[in-house]
Design a protein with these regions (language model features):
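PRPP-associated nucleotide enzymes
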Residues: 1-189
């Protein structure tokens, strides 16, 4: 745990963003815990504080462009960009795949940091990094508010998270009894 973990957890709890139930995650895995970052993102004072904490804890420097995948990373990515005085662009879903649209582009002057809300298995981060790597920019690294993965993630670039929480995840056919007793829900992701 870092110096800010208890504050970050408190922010998630105060905003009802740390949920407990039987959830189907975007990865298809099941969990008894879910970070619904959209609940935090309703409160810009909390978003501002989380962005400030992220910038205090990350080691990435001289960033001039923030890229976030829609939807989860948009609000926190934009606030980090605002605090840095950096440009903010986003990737959005087209036919369930991420794409860089709206005449957004990256070039050799861009030092890019990818910002996401929550990482579990890293699929969305990998997809976003694949898109960014097609441009002649310098990809500095990736950061998330929450890393809930149970293993060390390797994205081919440095990855840091404000909060590391290892809640267990399960295959649908290997659920513990407490989750078997609850109907599964797929929260917005």
């Amino acid at each position: 745990m870092n110096d800010f973990d208890s504050e970050v957890i408190s922010i998630f709890e105060e905003t009802n963003a740390l949920l407990k139930w039987h959830f189907i995650l975007r990865s298809g895995m099941r969990s008894g815990h879910f970070f619904q970052c959209a609940q935090v993102c309703q409160h810009m004072d909390k978003v501002t504080r989380l962005a400030t904490l992220i910038l205090k804890t990350i080691s990435f420097k001289d960033i001039n462009t923030i890229v976030s995948p829609a939807m989860g990373g948009l609000v926190i990515g934009q606030e980090i960009a605002r605090q840095l005085g950096a440009r903010f662009i986003f990737l959005e879903k087209v036919n369930d795949r991420l794409a860089l649209r709206r005449n957004f582009s990256l070039d050799s002057k861009d030092r890019v940091l990818l910002v996401e809300d929550v990482v579990t298995k890293g699929g969305r981060v990998r997809e976003a990094l694949d898109i960014i790597s097609k441009y002649e920019c310098e990809l500095v690294g990736a950061v998330s508010m929450v890393d809930r993965s149970s293993e060390e993630l390797n994205f081919g670039v440095p990855f840091e998270a404000l909060l590391k929480m290892n809640f267990p995840t399960y295959e649908a056919d290997k659920l513990p009894q407490d989750l078997l007793n609850l109907p599964a829900t797929k929260p917005g992701s």
